[in-house]
From Swiss-Prot:
Renumbered residue ranges of the record's region Disordered: 1-25
Pathways involved: Purine metabolism; AMP biosynthesis via de novo pathway; AMP from IMP: step 1/2
Annotated active site: 43, 71
Binding positions for IMP per the UniProt entry: 43-46, 68-71, 163, 177, 256, 271, 335
Subunit structure: Homodimer.
Protein name: Adenylosuccinate synthetase isozyme 1
Free-text function comment from the UniProt entry: Component of the purine nucleotide cycle (PNC), which interconverts IMP and AMP to regulate the nucleotide levels in various tissues, and which contributes to glycolysis and ammoniagenesis. Catalyzes the first committed step in the biosynthesis of AMP from IMP.
Keyword tags: Cytoplasm, GTP-binding, Ligase, Magnesium, Metal-binding, Nucleotide-binding, Purine biosynthesis
Enzyme class name: ligase
Subcellular location: Cytoplasm
Textual note on the cofactor: Binds 1 Mg(2+) ion per subunit.
Encoding gene, per UniProt annotation: ADSS1
Amino acid sequence: MSGTRASNDRPPSAGGVKRGRLQHEAATTGSRVTVVLGAQWGDEGKGKVVDLLATDADVVSRCQGGNNAGHTVVVDGKEYDFHLLPSGIINPKAVSFIGNGVVVHLPGLFEEAEKNEKKGLKDWEKRLVISDRAHLVFDFHQAVDGLQEVQRQAQEGKNIGTTRKGIGPAYSSKAARTGLRICDLLSDFDEFSSRFKNLARQHQSMFPSLEVDVEGQLKRLKGFAERIRPMVRDGVYFMYEALHGPPKKILVEGANAALLDIDFGTYPFVTSSNCTVGGVCTGLGIPPQNIGEVYGVVKAYTTRVGIGAFPTEQINEIGDLLQSRGHEWGVTTGRKRRCGWLDLMILRYAHMVNGFTALALTKLDILDALDEIKVGVAYKLGGKRIPYFPANQEILQKVEVEYETLPGWKADTTGARKWEDLPPQAQSYIRFVENHVGVAVKWVGVGKSRDSMIQLF
């Protein structure tokens, strides 16, 4: 037996500690993040839910997207609009973190901050941390975004309906491994300048009409570099410290929504990032075991901006009523949102992908004026129910929606502050959603302000 080890022997663990205990500790130590995600096509009211949870959070994070997102938060009668900044930046006690999965347009970041400063936002620079691995969006990315939309319209007679914020082109540069990151900007500026010029030339070769003021943009970027330098950290280490140091409440604010996810959304009419729960891990550099609560935010009806399949859309007086009562214009684009009945197939699909632990049902008050309310409960193809959400857009356009009709409540719910204040028919509507999706509703929104979110448990 000399020089050999019996088959049931194991090499000693470091320090003689039993391997099983190490594995257990590795799997269970650390805080867990609370995630807020959109469950439809965006504009569900995620910012309001985040604002509610951010009041006692220590860290509020963004993990994907860019300034194509739009979150509105009302505090003390003041309406703040956020696109790139986490809406938790309002909390003076919390650190706001922009993770590596976010693409950052620096001029847009400072413009957004300055607009909100005029409304009362203070000392945001002291509370903002930006991952050094986050990719940059340049002005020419935004110009290319617009040129691509024009091309698509000319070639196919339709466009994707992007926000023209350069998000898709920036993620394309990232995937092509030609993109530039925050850490590159803060390192050797001569090297950064060389790579920036090459990237600009690449885009000009693809789009001959593209004009790029290379020297002007580099001058601006050099100025921005010094402004953001104090905010930049190694993002992975920052999150590791937050998770494994003294216990902290960490909140993740998802941008966009499940049906806009690059993989699971209604492709190609989607955004360019993963806005489902998997994007939290890749966009912040954290392991799955540190995901805790996952809250899905759902509007009490359905809206969508731009083109693409929308099975429950109401192109009639119902759609017009929802649009006008709900003030359905995009925060980022100002575009009118398409409106329709609540679609439970979408919610069940979003739950399959995200594993929601609870839902927030927002804008219930918009339904106050309706005599009856329809809810899409199933899709049919060829007269037969299908148990899945179709990936193919042409098929999704053809589905027949099976509806159930519920009685309206014809009463003002905006003053409700607890479950008992809601009309019985409104309570039945909420329970109907819970039963069909299989997830409990934790909050019900009946207005814009922070105190108009009714907590059920």
